[in-house]
């Protein structure tokens, strides 16, 4: 038996899944101040339906990291950069507390310029004097040689043990220095909050006496273990939108071109499925104005949800925040959900309360309640359609989007909008009708996020870089470095076997060994190194992954 729990900003949803059937579902308000209690409430409603059967795995999706970064509530964090030669320092506008230091490594990992120890001492003293307790360190080509990052890390540990540090070579083995620096910075900013969240999960699991694998849903639609997430919490950014994307795919499953529209209480998430495959952001997740090395779906969030409150200020306003539940569910203020409830005669909750609160606002606005509802419905539909169309303009630049048009020899055409979330039944059919496409709603659409979390499989990508003339190799994630036993005649097949073995080792460490056989290579590159008039060796770059997808036993659910 499997449990999926989606911890949203407004509601926490849970699903108990067994052998192709959803056995139980639950939806509870999220208590940000006491998250453990929310998790316990969800577990307490799901577990009785499991009886004596063992819960094999529990998967959580969460907006914790997304909300921390979006609201600017992350703790003040410093970034020490060793950019070497190239771009001017003002090109790296990543954060306010940024410090540049000398020290250069070339693209082969050779040290060109050593650290200036006095300069580093001065930078660390300034960081400590400012009261900053978190530091990210990023050196250009540290994925080829991390010696300078390690030196700074060791100095911080020795001289300032109360300051936590994250280094880029442990976060990502990929090239593109600005993205690696940004990813490391956001990791350092969120790691302590994530550790607290992980501790609350562990406490809730322990208090209910469960002996289950605990996984977290990542931005790429796969999962990793809770322990692994504590080292790379940034990979959980957009975990919520990933859950809705996989949940929408799990419920619909046909090979159609679909927009997944997840209408939550506070926000709406938009994602695209092309021919049954989610569209990925080719440049990685974008946090603010910065691209990162986080693999993620191409998603967008709109500050509009079913609980978005309504107001009058010279005109009807649909606010980008909530003041509690919809009136039909006992709230004190009229919301988007209430307007759709009355306009479409949906009979959701206490429809009389919806009508009463809307009538009060209509009187304030000097209009009939029916006109108020009409205006709200139009505002919401137009705002969502505008957001979808803006996303299409962005998606047109994604390689997978263009490839689909080339392969199918026709322009991309949207087939349907998949509705996810409690408010989807009210809003999505209206949006789809206005866009002249089909809408898809399932009985389990309100808890599709939790279903998506429950039935996706663990994922892992390993990248190996080998430089035979320098007798060096590196493996990511984790910042593994080593020397070659035989650097003479290494061939691509040997490099692939080496990458496969590291993937298997990491799978064993993370309890994913049973999925290792499903791995595939996504990058196989080799380059000859010429010295004088002859070849002196080769450089290999190999990538192997267990790609995102559903667990083998998932074949869909019945309505």
Task: Spell out what each predicted region is.
Residues 1-559:
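N-terminally biased helix-coil "hinge/interface" segments that flank
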């Amino acid at each position: 038996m499997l449990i999926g729990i989606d911890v949203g900003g407004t509601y926490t949803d849970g699903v108990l899944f067994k052998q192709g059937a959803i056995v139980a579902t639950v939806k509870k308000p999220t208590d940000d101040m006491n998250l453990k209690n929310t998790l316990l409430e969800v577990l307490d409603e799901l577990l009785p339906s499991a009886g004596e059967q063992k819960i094999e795995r529990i998967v959580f999706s969460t907006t914790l990291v997304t909300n921390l970064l979006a609201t600017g509530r992350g703790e003040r964090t410093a970034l020490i950069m060793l950019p070497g030669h190239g771009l001017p320092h003002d090109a790296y506008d990543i954060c306010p507390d940024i410090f540049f230091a000398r020290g250069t490594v070339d693209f082969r990992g050779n040290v060109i310029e050593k650290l200036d120890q006095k300069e580093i001492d001065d930078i660390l003293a300034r960081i400590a004097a400012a009261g900053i307790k978190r530091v990210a360190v990023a050196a250009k080509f540290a994925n080829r040689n991390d010696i300078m990052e390690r030196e700074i890390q060791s100095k911080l540990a020795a001289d300032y043990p109360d300051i936590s540090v994250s280094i880029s070579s442990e976060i990502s083995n990929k090239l593109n220095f600005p993205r690696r620096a940004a990813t490391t910075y956001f990791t350092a900013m969120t790691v302590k909050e994530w550790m607290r969240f992980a501790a609350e999960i562990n406490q809730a699991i322990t208090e209910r006496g469960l002996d289950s694998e605990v996984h977290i849903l990542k931005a790429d639609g796969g999962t990793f273990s809770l322990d692994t997430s504590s080292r790379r919490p940034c990979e959980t950014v957009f975990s919520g939108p990933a859950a809705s994307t996989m949940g929408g795919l799990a419920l619909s499953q046909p090979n159609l071109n679909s927009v997944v529209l997840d209408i939550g209480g506070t926000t709406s998430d938009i994602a695209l499925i092309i021919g049954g495959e989610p569209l990925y952001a080719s440049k990685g997740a974008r946090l603010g104005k910065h691209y990162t090395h986080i693999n993620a779906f191409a998603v967008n969030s709109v500050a509009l949800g079913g609980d978005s409150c309504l107001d009058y200020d010279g005109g009807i306003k649909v606010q980008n925040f909530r003041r509690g539940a919809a009136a039909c569910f006992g709230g004190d203020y009229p919301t988007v959900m209430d307007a759709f409830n009355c306009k479409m005669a949906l009979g959701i909750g206490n429809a009389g309360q919806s009508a009463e609160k809307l009538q009060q606002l209509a009187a304030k606005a000097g209009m009939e309640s029916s006109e108020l509802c009409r205006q709200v419905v139009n505002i919401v539909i137009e705002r969502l359609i505008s957001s979808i169309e803006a996303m299409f303009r962005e998606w047109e630049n994604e390689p997978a989007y263009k490839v689909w048009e080339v392969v199918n020899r026709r322009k991309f055409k949207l087939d349907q909008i998949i509705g996810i979330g409690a408010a989807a039944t009210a809003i999505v059919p209206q949006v789809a009708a206005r866009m002249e496409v089909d809408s898809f709603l399932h009985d389990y659409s309100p808890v599709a996020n939790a279903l998506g979390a429950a039935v996706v499989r663990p994922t892992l990508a390993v990248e190996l870089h080998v430089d035979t003339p320098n007798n060096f190799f590196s493996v990511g994630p984790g910042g593994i470095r080593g020397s070659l036993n035989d650097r003479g005649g290494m061939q691509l097949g040997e490099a692939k076997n080496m990458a496969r073995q590291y993937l298997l080792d990491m799978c064993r460490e993370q309890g994913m060994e049973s999925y290792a056989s499903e791995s595939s290579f996504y990058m196989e590159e080799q380059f000859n190194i010429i010295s004088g008039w002859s070849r002196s060796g080769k450089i290999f770059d190999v990538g192997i992954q267990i790609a995102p997808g559903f667990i083998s036993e998932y074949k869909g659910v019945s309505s």
